[in-house]
């Protein structure tokens, strides 16, 4: 039935046009209802040192819901402004925590990350907290929670990680409905929160140019930051790019509502928005054994992005790897080196 519906919609609505980048960015921001938010009343909740790193747990208000908590990590003895990176946690089917999936805070090494977090890291991140590793390379790294994760999660009446995550899977449908009823979208609210985090990082006197990086749902968030923040100097999207049209048959239900903001297909395909920042630097990592995206969709996306970067081919870096859905240590190191080239120049 969906295949037949797709044919009717294609004939009548003509989805996936190819708008110019600046026009697409403006139209997509309006269609998604991206909120204009700011990180207000920023507080340092805790600070610590961990060997060669210094860390802070920050909190701020975006104007609704519980305060956003974030980890800020930087080299302990660094002098002068350093390039900044917003490190964006994934969806991962785990909403009990957000930033902890990619960043170690003050509780490490004792008692250390939870067993649930360790499993996510082993499955997706090569077993390590990549935000801390990135900070050790000479970056100021900000890892914030976002709506429905960690400090920004909803009170669902469940106090254990496993049962909470099960409840949160169904509750995401409710969140998406409320956002639509209010004229925004799940993606639009998340993008607004991430834009606020990036603006805060950029405002710090110890931070210079700013980029962002994320895997999966974090890669989606990185792509939206790249599209909607004109001062985002370099963007890494890991295992989160395929054409919509190649996902219709069997892949739609595997993904968060954030990937399907209402109205976007009337403006362009997902790779069009990912590449709408052209000619600004973009790295996309494709996992050829990704169970969440079809290889033909990744191949089509790469061709589409290459076309949008036709006049600046050196600004687009495609990384192909015969791996499952992940941002493993090898791919992390490639991203770190690329971010250093783009942000430290």
Residue ranges of model-derived segments:
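N-terminal targeting or regulatory segments adjacent to alpha/beta-hydrolase or S9 domains
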Residues: 1-56, 62, 98, 137, ...
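A short loop-to-beta-strand scaffold at the N-terminal edge of the catalytic core in hydrolase folds
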Residues: 55-59, 64-76
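Short beta-strand element of the alpha/beta-hydrolase
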Residues: 70, 80-92
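C-terminal catalytic histidine-bearing segment of alpha/beta-hydrolase fold enzymes
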Residues: 309-345
